[in-house]
């Protein structure tokens, strides 16, 4: 190679491959809640394939398993635990203020 052409070649940078989120021994099944819960957002939505870093086949199987778990009511359709807790706090504070004003 000429000396002028060698100057333009970049050295390849080393990068570390991440481990796949689903190991070969893991079964994608609606009963495997520990596996399924990793692929659901805080709101209860199914995370996208780009976020999960899954293959197309794995993402399809995960989606089917999540939908089966929702239908069999082992998984909620929407996760509103935070909102319910906040609402109960608000009603508790409102009732205490109502009682305080009535005592006068």
Curated annotation (Swiss-Prot):
Keyword Nucleotidyltransferase tagged: no
GO MF terms, alphabetically ordered: small ribosomal subunit rRNA binding; structural constituent of ribosome
Subcellular location: Plastid, Chloroplast
Alphabetically ordered keywords of this record: Chloroplast, Plastid, Ribonucleoprotein, Ribosomal protein, RNA-binding, rRNA-binding
Pfam families, per the entry: Ribosomal_S18
Biological processes annotated in GO: translation
GO cellular component terms, A-Z: chloroplast; mitochondrial small ribosomal subunit
Subunit structure comment from the entry: Part of the 30S ribosomal subunit.
Protein name: Small ribosomal subunit protein bS18c
GN (gene name): rps18
């Amino acid at each position: 190679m000429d000396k002028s052409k060698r100057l333009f070649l970049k050295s390849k940078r080393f990068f570390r491959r991440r481990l796949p989120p689903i190991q070969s021994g893991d079964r994608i099944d609606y009963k495997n809640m520990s596996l399924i819960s990793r692929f659901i957002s805080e709101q209860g939505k199914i995370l996208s394939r780009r976020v999960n870093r899954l293959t197309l086949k794995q993402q399809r199987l995960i989606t089917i398993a999540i939908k089966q778990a929702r239908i069999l009511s082992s998984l909620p359709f929407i996760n509103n635990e935070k909102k319910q807790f906040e609402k109960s706090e608000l009603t508790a504070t409102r009732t205490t203020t109502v009682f305080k004003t009535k005592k006068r």
